[in-house]
Curated annotation (Swiss-Prot):
The gene is SURF1. This is Surfeit locus protein 1. It comes from the Eukaryota. GO terms for biological process: mitochondrial cytochrome c oxidase assembly. PANTHER family: SURFEIT LOCUS PROTEIN (PTHR23427), SURFEIT LOCUS PROTEIN 1 (PTHR23427:SF2). Belongs to the SURF1 family. May play a role in mitochondrial respiratory chain complex IV assembly. Probably involved in the biogenesis of the COX complex. PROSITE patterns: SURF1. It is found in: Mitochondrion inner membrane. GO terms for cellular component: mitochondrial inner membrane; mitochondrion. Its main location: mitochondrion. Keywords: Membrane, Mitochondrion, Mitochondrion inner membrane, Transmembrane, Transmembrane helix. InterPro entries: Surf1/Shy1, Surf1/Surf4.
Length: 309
């Protein structure tokens, strides 16, 4: 009974204090933002608004929305930052690739060394000039096709042109017995046009005597996408598979490209080595930095200038 009496005495006082706080809030909102009606009862009209504004639930919702906006803002900033880092990484990759191409070009122009039969050493000698002495076995020719003639002078003249007039044909691969080493290797003698593919059409170039030969070491190739499989039965090869070529000819899986000085009248044109390393890093640099610039601009408009996208 004492408790009920206390509540009855305190209840009216608590109710008056609650009404005073609500009235004060309503009057404040009316003065700063909500016009009074002609009847002057802005308190009545804005009561539901003020209650919502003053409620703890509204404050929690606003805080949650602000937190979500912050996460979105800084999360989206990762997009241009990541693109910038990838573009910078591609600059380093391009520098590394250009240095590698320069090293290979320098290796091609170095003095030839005697050919080694050590497989581990051969792996380190790709594009390195070597010299051998021996003779060809023209009865076991192989053909890598289609191929176009590697002609640096023609390529320099046609640089920038939309069309090219390179002649199509094949590279002739011939077993070569090395008299000093006592083994047979594979030699890419060079390019022949289609009309000279058959050996009987170039008998003058089918040299039989023992010769000194200089060429560059080449390793086995992996088949690239969209490149056909080698057709061993028809002697149509599309990439260097040294193990398969050695099995067909009985030679060792050692391959060299004969240099241009090995060319004989009526025979294949030597010097068909092309240093081909993919170097598309400039395209990637432009792509990543372009994406960085575009997304940075959109982020700035959205979160700094507050312009709807």
């Amino acid at each position: 009974m004492a408790t009920w009496g206390l509540l009855l005495r305190a209840g009216p006082r608590l109710l008056r204090e609650r009404r005073a706080r609500i009235s004060h809030c309503l009057l404040r909102r009316t003065f700063f933002g909500f016009p009074r009606t002609k009847a002057g009862s802005a308190v009545t009209q804005q009561g539901d608004v003020c209650l919502r504004l003053c409620s703890p639930r509204s404050s929690t919702t606003a805080t949650s929305a602000a937190g979500e906006d912050a996460w979105l803002k800084w999360g989206l900033l990762l997009v241009p930052l990541t693109a910038f880092c990838l573009g910078t990484w591609q600059i380093q990759r391009r520098k590394w690739k250009l240095d590698l191409i320069a090293q290979l070009a320098s290796r091609l122009s170095s003095e030839p060394i005697p050919l080694t039969l050590d497989p581990m050493e051969l792996k380190e000698l790709e594009y390195r000039p070597v010299k051998v002495r021996g003779h060809f076995d023209h009865s076991k020719e192989l053909y890598i096709l289609p191929r176009s003639l590697v002609d640096p002078e023609r390529e320099a003249r046609e640089a920038g042109k939309l069309t090219s007039h390179a002649e199509n044909g094949a590279n002739v691969i011939t077993p070569f017995y090395c008299t000093e080493l006592g083994v047979t290797i594979l030699v890419n003698r060079g390019f022949v046009p289609k009309k000279k593919l058959k050996p009987e059409t170039r008998l003058k170039g089918q040299i039989e005597e023992e010769i000194d030969l200089t060429g560059v070491v080449r390793l086995s190739e992996k088949r690239k996408p969209f490149v056909p499989e080698n057709n061993i039965e028809k002697n149509r090869w599309h990439y260097r598979d040294l193990e398969a070529m050695a099995k067909v000819t009985g030679a060792e899986p050692i391959f060299i490209d004969a240099d241009f000085r090995s060319t004989v009248p009526g025979g294949p044109i030597g010097g068909q080595t092309r240093v081909s390393l993919r170097n598309e890093h400039m395209q990637y640099i432009v792509t990543w930095y372009g994406l960085c610039a575009a997304t940075s601009f959109l982020w700035y408009r959205k979160f700094i200038q507050k312009i709807p996208l």
